């Protein structure tokens, strides 16, 4: 299995266009040791030819241009993307669908009922695409027991589970959570049995998750915030990290503590907010992650399982 990180930042990217926090300001001025990052998305393949795209960020065109296998150039119109799996309906995970509207071939989109509802009502991107390329929508089972496959992506099997998290702010049921608003996915390579667990919007470790995470050779999870009060402390938001569906890395029950329970797996944080000190490669927080064997995803990162 080849996992390629197209984008590793949370919504807004890094640096964020309107932000002058120490990280964003420092990156622009070249006074901190850090890498620019686009908004989070990965693609996965078992054969290096047919790729499944997870989420479509607003930066998707740049991300495709920077990863050659997604444009193999076999015909006058071509793509290496054979299917798109949407983890949720968040703006930073779905806006890129509009950038993929060209062509006569329908987009093969895999999503839950709740995500489909949001993308045909509150933010009707799929309705818009029907006037361009069109969409073949495939349902994703979320009970953790029934797997699904993506046509034309041989050698891969996917098992999804519902995660406790918040629907997007635009969603008609923003304050009435439903199973399927956000999912985590166990990705299995049927050729060698290797597995990866991908959950960029993991707000809470629920009882049904350890059984899936224990199977994974690689765990890629929510790296949005370092502390629960990160945005509060900077005066940027009136809510805590957990209030908006993100489990911070530090503190009791935080993501570091969770990942410590899976020492045999490769552990990677993705979907990192521009305020998070782990973006600074020489920060004390980054040193602590390294000490624990936890990696920080970056654009262009390749994981081979």
Curated annotation (Swiss-Prot):
Domain of life: Bacteria
SUPFAM superfamilies hit by this protein: Metallo-hydrolase/oxidoreductase (SSF56281)
Stored Pfam families: Lactamase_B_2 (PF12706)
Pathway membership: Cofactor biosynthesis; pyrroloquinoline quinone biosynthesis
Keyword Flavoprotein: no
Keywords: PQQ biosynthesis, Transport
InterPro entries assigned to the protein according to its UniProt record, in alphabetical order: Metallo-B-lactamas, PQQ_synth_PqqB, RibonucZ/Hydroxyglut_hydro
Record GO biological process: pyrroloquinoline quinone biosynthetic process
Protein role: May be involved in the transport of PQQ or its precursor to the periplasm.
Family note: Belongs to the PqqB family.
PANTHER family on file: COENZYME PQQ SYNTHESIS PROTEIN B, HYDROLASE C777.06C-RELATED-RELATED
Name used for this protein in its record: Coenzyme PQQ synthesis protein B
Organism in which the protein naturally occurs: Methylobacillus flagellatus
